[in-house]
Amino acid sequence: MSRPLGFIGYEFGDDEMFVQQMIEKKSNAEQAKMLEQQKKMLECTETMPEESEPVPMKCLDFEEAFQSESVSKGYESPYKNISFLKEDAVTVNTMSHCPADDIAKLIRNIQNSVYTLGIEEARQCRRGKLLNVLKPTGSASPRYLQPTPPKNVAEETTGSQ
């Protein structure tokens, strides 16, 4: 039994069902309107000119331009290309089966080793500098780089009186 729009009956709880039906009708209408808007947005309005060549031929020409050997013959890479040794291939194959956590741990260990070696090298350089080991023996250093002996303060104070 259909009720007129806006009728809310109070007998036997019909008002809740009527309100629910009105909400469903309203949401269905909104969904239909939304679908129409989406269809219009997806509609293609582009037209292809008939006098130009078809798109696939243009794509093939583009691909052929990059596949030609003329580009690679004249190009020289600024990077060194070092071929893999057998040990390198074995290492790569071994590492490909390792989980990511193990690889991250290995990289951290390598970074720690490099850091430790850097600290040790810096310590050795400072030590060599202090001992004047790093200077070439044949050349004399300029006067401003030569160490000056400390002045005797006691002689200066007694000499001025």
Curated annotation (Swiss-Prot):
Coiled coil: none annotated. It is found in: Nucleus. Component of the DRM complex, at least composed of lin-9, lin-35, lin-37, lin-52, lin-53, lin-54- dpl-1 and efl-1. Interacts with zft-11; the interaction is required to suppress the activation of non-neuronal genes in neurons. Belongs to the lin-52 family. One of its GO terms (biological process) is regulation of DNA-templated transcription. Residues 137-161 are annotated as: Disordered. Keywords: Nucleus, Repressor, Transcription, Transcription regulation. Synthetic multivulva class B (synMuvB) protein. SynMuvB proteins are required to repress the induction of vulval development by Ras signaling and probably act by forming the multiprotein DRM complex that represses transcription. In association with the zinc finger protein ztf-11, negatively regulates the expression of non-neuronal genes during neurogenesis. This is Protein lin-52. GO terms for cellular component: DRM complex. The gene is lin-52. Signal peptide: none annotated.
